[in-house]
From Swiss-Prot:
Family affiliation: Belongs to the DisA family.
Binding site for ATP: G70, L88, I101, R102, H103, R104, T105
InterPro entries for this protein: DisA (IPR050338), DisA/LigA_HHH (IPR041663), DisA_sf (IPR038331), DNA_integrity_DisA_N_sf (IPR036888), DNA_integrity_scan_DisA_link (IPR018906), DNA_integrity_scan_DisA_N (IPR003390), DNA_integrity_scanning_protein (IPR023763), RuvA_2-like (IPR010994)
Subunit relationships: Homooctamer.
The protein's name in its UniProt record: DNA integrity scanning protein DisA
Record organism: Carboxydothermus hydrogenoformans (strain ATCC BAA-161 / DSM 6008 / Z-2901)
UniProt xrefs under PROSITE patterns: DAC (PS51794)
EC code(s) of this entry: 2.7.7.85
Gene: disA
GO biological process: DNA repair
């Protein structure tokens, strides 16, 4: 929920939005400003004085009204200017790390009401967002673009390492030589890529209309990464149906960077004992990830195959007649599965 509020806050003030245009005009004029988004009862409790406007929002109106000392109150959707020149009187007992009066007031109002409050520094020419305990200072578009491009370059390197790790895992799965260490390494690399993705997403939200190219690059670089992670978990998790692959991946997402480097923690999340010696234990994949790579093979059929044969090794060694006996598989599909597995193995050996 907190993340959703942060996303909405960053998107609402991204370059190209009407609100950002108004903020930039105030910034250039060096008048400073204090803007509250929303007019709930909780927000109006801290508002005193000022005058009602209740007119459609426009960047020019926001700029003109900011010339007065008081705060400006906008509607929740930012489409109407409700009040101007209002005084904000939050509870002075609420702790604040800010020194300036405008920013201290903004922080306290945000903490007391959970509203998005925007403070524009007259002296430093900085736009700062407050919402609950969240605080974020907006940077110049050129600075964010530079950071985003650096993050994309890092993501490219991490994706290349992930692809090699997954290819090696695929090869080991065909040879039935996987250990828990191989599984942990693959899941670790998946999460590392997803963490960089989340960092770049924040830059994209903040860039708004300026972030289209970065967004396209990101989409290409993270294609199928989360799906691969979920399928690996399906292949190796010992946990019951109450612990879904999505739930396990979400758990790993909450870990610190240090915890993510601990392979024994990763295998413990899959339901194995957490000792270091367990990492050398051989394991056999159920076959979800490999079977998912065969074209036009429905999820229901993959599930029936795994339920019938138990693991990838048994599926690979099954005859066409045995495959044909599985629900949802006729002779044509049975041959397609055998041929698909053969091609995948040849491609893996060729790539390596």
């Amino acid at each position: 929920m907190k993340d959703e509020r942060i996303v909405l806050a960053l998107k609402s003030v991204a370059p190209g939005t009407p609100l950002r245009e108004g903020l930039e005009q105030i910034l250039r004029a060096k008048t400073g400003g204090l803007i509250v988004i929303g007019d709930t009862a909780k927000i109006m409790e801290v508002v005193e004085g000022g005058f009602a406007i209740n007119t459609d929002y426009s960047p020019a109106y926001l700029y003109e009204l900011a010339k007065m000392d008081g705060a400006i109150i906008l509607s929740e959707d930012g489409k109407k200017i409700l009040y101007a020149n209002a005084q904000l009187v939050p509870d002075p007992a609420i702790p604040s790390s800010e020194t300036g009066i405008r920013h201290r007031t903004a922080e306290r109002v945000a903490k007391q009401t959970n509203a998005l409050v925007i403070a524009i520094s007259q002296r430093r020419s900085v736009i700062t967002l407050y919402q609950g305990n969240f605080k974020y200072s907006l940077s110049e578009v050129s600075v964010i673009l530079n950071k985003a491009n650096q993050a994309i370059a890092t993501l490219e390197k991490y994706r290349a390492v992930l692809d090699k790790t997954l290819m090696r895992l695929t090869n080991l799965e065909f040879d039935d030589m996987v250990t828990l260490l191989d599984v942990a390494k693959a899941l670790q690399r998946v999460e590392m890529v997803l963490r960089i993705e989340r960092e770049i997403e924040r830059y994209i939200w903040e860039l708004g209309s300026e972030g289209r190219l970065i967004s396209m690059q990101l989409e290409e670089l993270i294609a199928n990464v989360e799906d691969e992670g979920l399928l690996i978990i399906q292949d190796y998790s010992l946990l019951g149906p109450e612990k879904t692959p999505e739930g396990i991946l979400s758990l790993i997402r909450t870990w610190s960077s240090e915890d993510l480097l601990d392979y024994s923690l990763i295998v413990r999340a899959l339901g194995y004992p957490g000792s270091a010696s367990i990492l050398d234990q051989p394991v056999s994949p159920r076959g979800y990830r490999i079977l998912d790579k065969i074209p036009r093979l429905p999820v229901a059929v993959i599930e029936n195959l795994v339920q019938t044969f138990g693991n990838l090794k048994n599926i690979m060694s099954a005859s066409i007649e045995e495959l044909d006996d599985v629900e949802g598989i006729g002779e044509v599909r049975a041959r397609s599965i055998k041929e698909g597995l053969k091609k995948l193995r040849e491609q893996t050996n060729y790539t390596l």
